[in-house]
Structures are given as structure tokens and as C-alpha cells.
């Protein structure tokens, strides 16, 4: 499983709320090493009001690996674009490593309201475009003067300079029209939460990625047994999901929640139970290596080339993921 010009595979870092302080640093380092050994290009590091700072977690990831690139979630409400650019160039200067940035407009309004931020959904994407515009120009070595609706800078430059080969790759979370428009304007990979492959549309040459979890085994029975063991039915989780829906204005969150899930598990690898139980925020593909690989190949044929996986349960899980991506890659012309 490698990140190359055709497919780029990212895992996801554990969240600090799921561990004690004593356990967390060990889990981050361990997951990062698993991901690197599995051939992942990078690893997503979340951000929100209830977890550790993603930049500090990213430094731990860099120190624990040789080449794995943190995909740092970047929320405009938390940090000025100059500060974000300074973080990127500082880590590059200290470690000689490239980062990826996942621009997050913010889907949970309560987090934003707690910060005094009442910016509406679409306007948050406009803010993200301005933010990325300033940040990327600084990282490119320009002296930036800019006056927009939300940010104003004058003759601003970045020191130390960022080498060209360490310029960050950029993603943006969002599948709404505003999110897709923002992705196009800033040249970012649009990260979507996919529908079933048979219901997805051709990406028509767009730079598209997806968030998806995978549980694959040699047989369908083994895969579903492992999936149900990891994600059992959870009434409290369903209640938490329903409460979260009431305070979210996220397009993808509502889209997934509205999807029908009556299809029999054994007949359909696309599985939303973990999402419905508030155990994760993406759909899962579950089944035999062959079945999941075939489903992934359908997404690749539609134009999806970047895949951000869920938090790996174990090193073995990443091995199975590697098997399905190799088979999917081999089956696509």
C-alpha cells in the first residue's frame, strides 16, 4: 500500500479523548509507525475544541517516523493564516519533513459558538478561501499585501523560507456546493464522505478524495465478524449521534444520516452502523479482500484518488487494507 501519483493513502491518528495522558503519546507513535510500515503517504490529525493541539501531535508523529507526513486539520477559527504558515515552515526547518493540510470550515456549530464565532456555513468556506490564499502565498515566499472581508495583511513575509520540495499538499473537507467551490478556488483535493459506489457520480476530472473505513478479511464471514466485534450496536451512541445532528450544519453529516441503511450486510459492503452509533464519522466498506477491492476500484474509476482511512484498530488491520488497495490498483486500467 503506497502513496503514489495514482493513489494516495492516509491513515488517521487516534484522538486524545480516547486515552489517558499516559497512554496517548504511546498510541500516537505506535499508530504512526504502523501507518508508515504499511506504506501510507500520511496520517490525518484531527482538530476540535475537545482534543489536543494537532500541531503538537504532528510533531510527535514526525519524531516517531522517518517519512510519514502528518495531514494537519486546520480550522480558521483557531489560528491566523500567518501562524499556520509559521507552523508549517518551522516544522520543515526543524525536521526537513513535508506536511499536508486539511482545511476545515467547521461542522459542529457549538464548538464555533463557544469561541464567539457565528459565521454561517457558506461564509465559513469563503473565510477558508481567504485564509488559504494568504497562507499559500506566504509559504511560496511572496511578500503579501491583501485586504479581504475577513483578513487584512500588509507587506507580510515568512521567515524562514520554505523549500519548494516541502510545500504542503492541501485538502479541504466538505461535499456541499460551497465546499466544492472552495476546493476548486484554492486548488485543494476535495475530501468527500462517499455514497455507495453505485450511487456516486463521476468526479469529472476534479481532484477528489474520500474518508472511508475498511474492514477486510479473507472471507465475508470473517470480515463481518471482525466489524461487528469492533462496532457493536450502541444505544447511547445512537442517542449521541441524534443530538450531534441537531447542532451540526454539516452537509456531509446530514447526507450520511439521511441515507437508507436497510440493505443486508452480506449483500452490500457499504456500512453506516459505526457512523450511526457515533463511533466514527465516515462510512465503512466491509467484506472479503476481493469484494472490498472491487468496490474501491469502482471509486477509483469514478475519479477518487486520495483515501483517508479511519483510525486503525491494529497493525493487522492495516495489512488487510494494504491487500485490498493493491488488488484495487491492479484491477483499474
Indicate where each model-derived feature is located.
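Catalytic domains of carbohydrate-active enzymes, especially glycoside hydrolases
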Residues: 27-47, 182-192, 298-304
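Acidic-and-aromatic substrate-binding clefts and catalytic sites of carbohydrate-active enzymes
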Residues: 43-54, 77-82, 192-200, 216-218, ...
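An alpha-helical appendage that flanks or caps ligand/catalytic pockets
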Residues: 1-3, 115, 121-162, 197-300
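N-terminal beta1-alpha1-beta2 module of alpha/beta enzyme domains
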Residues: 1-67, 147, 167-168
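Active-site mouth loops of central-metabolism enzymes
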Residues: 7-26, 73-77, 81, 166-175, ...
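Conserved, mostly hydrophobic/aromatic
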Residues: 35, 61, 91, 101, ...
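Alpha-helix-loop-beta-strand connector modules within alpha/beta enzyme cores
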Residues: 54-75, 127, 131, 322-333
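Hydrophobic faces of well-ordered beta-strands that scaffold small-molecule active sites
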Residues: 5-13, 43-45, 69-74, 99-103, ...
Amino acid at each position: 500500500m503506497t502513496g503514489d501519483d495514482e493513489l494516495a493513502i492516509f491513515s488517521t491518528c487516534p484522538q486524545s479523548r480516547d486515552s489517558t495522558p499516559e497512554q496517548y503519546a504511546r498510541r500516537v507513535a505506535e499508530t504512526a509507525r504502523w501507518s508508515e510500515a504499511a506504506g501510507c503517504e500520511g496520517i490525518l490529525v484531527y482538530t476540535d475544541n475537545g482534543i489536543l493541539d494537532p500541531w503538537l501531535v504532528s510533531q510527535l508523529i514526525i519524531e516517531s517516523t522517518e517519512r510519514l507526513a502528518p495531514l494537519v486539520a486546520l480550522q480558521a477559527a483557531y489560528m491566523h493564516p500567518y501562524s499556520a504558515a509559521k507552523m508549517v515552515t518551522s516544522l520543515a526547518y526543524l525536521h526537513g519533513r513535508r506536511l499536508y493540510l486539511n482545511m476545515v470550515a467547521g461542522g459542529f456549530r457549538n464548538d464555533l459558538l463557544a469561541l464567539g464565532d457565528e459565521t454561517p456555513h457558506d461564509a465559513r468556506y469563503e473565510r477558508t478561501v481567504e485564509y488559504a490564499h494568504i497562507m499559500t502565498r506566504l509559504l511560496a515566499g511572496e511578500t503579501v499585501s491583501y485586504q479581504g472581508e475577513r483578513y487584512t495583511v500588509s507587506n507580510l513575509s515568512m521567515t524562514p523560507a520554505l523549500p519548494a520540495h516541502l510545500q504542503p499538499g492541501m485538502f479541504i473537507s466538505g461535499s456541499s456546493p460551497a465546499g466544492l467551490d472552495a476546493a476548486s478556488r484554492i486548488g485543494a483535493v476535495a475530501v468527500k464522505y462517499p455514497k455507495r459506489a453505485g450511487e456516486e457520480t463521476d468526479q469529472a476530472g476534479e481532484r477528489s478524495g474520500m474518508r472511508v473505513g475498511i474492514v477486510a478479511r479473507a472471507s465475508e464471514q470473517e470480515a463481518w465478524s471482525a466489524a461487528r466485534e469492533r462496532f457493536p450496536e450502541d444505544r447511547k451512541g445512537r442517542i449521541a449521534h441524534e443530538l450531534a445532528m441537531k447542532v451540526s450544519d454539516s452537509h456531509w453529516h446530514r447526507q450520511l444520516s439521511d441515507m437508507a441503511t436497510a440493505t443486508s450486510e452480506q449483500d452490500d459492503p457499504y456500512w453506516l452502523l459505526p457512523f450511526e452509533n457515533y463511533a466514527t464519522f465516515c462510512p465503512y466498506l466491509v467484506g472479503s479482500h476481493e469484494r472490498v477491492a472491487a468496490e474501491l476500484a469502482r471509486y477509483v474509476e469514478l475519479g477518487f484518488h486520495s483515501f483517508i482511512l479511519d483510525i486503525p484498530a491494529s497493525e493487522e488491520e492495516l495489512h488487510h487494507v494494504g491487500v485490498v488497495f493493491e488488488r484495487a490498483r491492479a484491477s483499474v486500467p
